[in-house]
Amino acid sequence: MGTLPARRHIPPWVKVPEDLKDPEVFQVQTRLLKAIFGPDGSRIPYIEQVSKAMLELKALESSDLTEVVVYGSYLYKLRTKWMLQSMAEWHRQRQERGMLKLAEAMNALELGPWMK
C-alpha cells in the first residue's frame, strides 16, 4: 500500500502524509458491507466523520469479499477497524438467524422438496 488512496479529497481530520502510512486492512463479505454502509455506500461519509478515519473499499476479483482499508491516526484506525468488524459480525449473525427461522418455518409447514 505504498500509494495514496485515490480520492477527490481527503477529510480534514486526516493528516497528510503521516495518517496515510501503514493503514489497517481487512476483508469483509460484500453483502455485509452493503448492510453496514447502506445503498451505494451512502453512510460512508457519516461513518468516516464519526470515526475520524478515512475508508477505502476495494472489491476483490473472483471473490465475494471486499477489502476495507482504514486510514487515520493509530487509535482512530484501530477503533474504526474494530467497529466495522463488529458490525459485520452482528449483521452476519442476524442473517444466519433469519435463515434458521426460515428453515424452521418451512419444516413446520412440511413443504415438499420441490418447494425448498
Curated annotation (Swiss-Prot):
UniProt KW Oxidoreductase keyword: no
Signal peptide per UniProt: none
Entry GO MF terms: mRNA binding
Coiled coil: none
Keyword Acetylation: no
UniProt GO BP: regulation of gene expression
Ranges where the KH domain occurs: 23-84
Alphabetically ordered keywords of this record: Cytoplasm, Developmental protein, RNA-binding
The protein's role, per its UniProt record: Involved in the maintenance of embryonic stem (ES) cell pluripotency. Dispensable for self-renewal of pluripotent ES cells and establishment of germ cells. Associates with specific target mRNAs.
Family: Belongs to the KHDC1 family.
Protein name listed in UniProt: Developmental pluripotency-associated 5 protein
Organism: Homo sapiens
The organism's taxonomic lineage, starting at the top: Eukaryota, Metazoa, Chordata, Craniata, Vertebrata
